[in-house]
């Protein structure tokens, strides 16, 4: 059984950047009474059946992930670092009092979701990828703040195009609110960390307010250390001539109130393979002026250069080379590994288990039956 080619009727050059119809998603259910997960089931619908009093809707008991799949020139489909995303997902679930999804189940659901939607993985020569969105939430009906009787884990997928590509980021330091408390939920991937940011980022993007493309968050206690961008980690590079060293110094801004960035970890590993010096540490806001290049690093953005960070209260403008040699080398290497163009010496990519999870005879067309469910055996 061969992997389907990209959907012949899909408008790859003009598709919606928000949501596009695909074949369906994967679901499985955890029962607190038995402390066990059901087998994955493929649901040919984009919708969930959820009671309005579910804790995931009322009390924010939910966590999510984001990872990518790419099509190679030989029509293989590679999923990038799914085991690492599984580990981060388990951490996020534990923070909001949910049962962690075992790695084997997480991987099975991810592979099934991609396999059953394989024709929606963009062509190899296209700039996009398939974005994979695992989600877990408390799903049983209840009013009280008790442990739910039921949790739902699901995996959705979407063809995805980088919205900004290599366009340099212009960021504003967020000074009017704190994204995360020092000992709060900032280091896990939960919706409550992102919803409050939206009105502030929308306001910052207005032309009359400077037209900033992103917010940079700082620590809530001292307002002086970098946490992260709203949806990406911050990495800075000092060139050898700045530090009188033989190699560049790559610094990842570390914060206990920011999520562990798998993309940043990948960039660090690549930089180390180049022989560069790597640091993971607290970065003071004022230290930004010492970097020659700064990147926003995350799943959706991969690596995006930053040209300017503005600290409004002090009037400081931190400027950086926006298309520098360090960015170019790191981005080309990471992108090449993800697309199968460069040897994956780090063993990050998993080949899609299509023989195991693909469905024979599928015609590649989104179904009109939103109730059809395909069960996988226990």
UniProtKB/Swiss-Prot annotation:
It holds the Pfam family Aminotran_4. Pathway: Secondary metabolite biosynthesis. It is an enzyme of class 2 (transferase). GO terms for biological process: branched-chain amino acid metabolic process. Gene3D superfamilies: 3.30.470.10, D-amino Acid Aminotransferase, subunit A, domain 2 (3.20.10.10). Apicidin F, like the other known apicidins, is a cyclic tetrapeptides with anti-malarial properties via histone deacetylase inhibitory activity. It comes from the Eukaryota. Pyridoxal 5'-phosphate binds at residues 88, 228. The modification N6-(pyridoxal phosphate)lysine is found at residue 189. Residues 359-378 are annotated as: Disordered. Its cofactor is pyridoxal 5'-phosphate. Keywords: Aminotransferase, Pyridoxal phosphate, Transferase. GO terms for molecular function: branched-chain-amino-acid transaminase activity. Its EC number is 2.6.1.-. Induction: Expression is positively regulated by the apicidin F cluster-specific transcription factor apf2 that binds to the eight-base-pair motif 5'-TGACGTGA-3' called the 'Api-box' that is found in all promoters of the apicidin F cluster except in the promoter region of apf2 itself. Belongs to the class-IV pyridoxal-phosphate-dependent aminotransferase family. Aminotransferase; part of the gene cluster that mediates the biosynthesis of the cyclic tetrapeptide apicidin F (APF). The non-ribosomal peptide synthetase apf1 incorporates four different amino acids to produce apicidin F: L-phenylalanine, D-pipecolic acid (D-pip), N-methoxy-L-tryptophan and L-2-aminooctanedioic acid. L-Phenylalanine is the only proteinogenic amino acid directly used by apf1. The 3 other apf1 substrates are non-proteinogenic and have to be modified by other enzymes of the cluster. This is Aminotransferase apf4. It comes from Gibberella fujikuroi (strain CBS 195.34 / IMI 58289 / NRRL A-6831) (Bakanae and foot rot disease fungus). The lineage of its organism: Eukaryota, Fungi, Dikarya, Ascomycota, Pezizomycotina. The gene is apf4.
């Amino acid at each position: 059984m061969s992997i389907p080619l990209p959907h012949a009727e899909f408008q790859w050059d003009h598709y919606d950047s928000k949501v596009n119809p695909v074949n369906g998603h994967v679901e499985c259910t955890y029962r607190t009474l038995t402390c066990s997960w059901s087998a994955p089931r493929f649901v040919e619908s984009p919708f969930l059946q959820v009671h309005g009093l579910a804790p995931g809707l009322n009390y924010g008991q939910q966590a999510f992930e984001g990872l990518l799949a790419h099509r190679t020139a030989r029509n293989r489909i590679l999923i990038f670092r799914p085991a690492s995303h599984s580990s981060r997902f388990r951490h996020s679930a534990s923070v909001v009092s949910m049962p962690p999804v075992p790695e084997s189940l997480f991987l099975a659901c991810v592979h099934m979701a991609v396999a059953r939607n394989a024709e929606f993985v963009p062509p190899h020569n296209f700039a996009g990828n398939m974005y994979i969105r695992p989600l877990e939430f408390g799903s049983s009906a209840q009013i009280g703040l008790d442990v739910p009787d039921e949790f739902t884990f699901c995996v959705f997928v979407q063809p995805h195009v980088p919205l900004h590509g290599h366009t340099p980021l212009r960021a504003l330091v967020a000074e009017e609110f704190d994204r995360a408390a020092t000992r709060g939920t900032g280091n896990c991937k939960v919706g409550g960390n992102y919803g409050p940011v939206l009105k502030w980022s929308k306001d910052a993007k207005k032309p009359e307010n400077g037209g900033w493309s992103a917010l940079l968050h700082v620590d809530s206690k001292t307002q002086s250390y970098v946490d992260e961008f709203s949806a990406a980690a911050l990495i800075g590079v000092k060139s050898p001539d700045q530090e009188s060293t033989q190699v560049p110094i790559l610094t990842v801004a570390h914060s206990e109130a920011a999520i562990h960035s798998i993309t940043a970890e990948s960039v660090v590993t690549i930089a180390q393979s180049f022989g560069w010096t790597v640091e993971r540490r607290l970065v003071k806001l004022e230290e930004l002026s010492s970097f020659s290049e700064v990147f926003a690093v995350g799943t959706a953005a991969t690596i995006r250069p930053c040209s300017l960070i503005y600290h409004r209260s002090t009037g400081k403008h931190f400027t950086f080379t926006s298309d520098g040699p360090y960015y170019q080398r790191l981005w080309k290497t990471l992108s090449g590994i993800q697309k199968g163009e460069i040897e994956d010496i780090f063993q990050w990519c998993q080949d899609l288990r299509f023989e195991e999870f693909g469905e024979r005879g599928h015609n590649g067309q989104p179904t009109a039956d939103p109730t059809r469910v395909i069960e996988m055996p226990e």
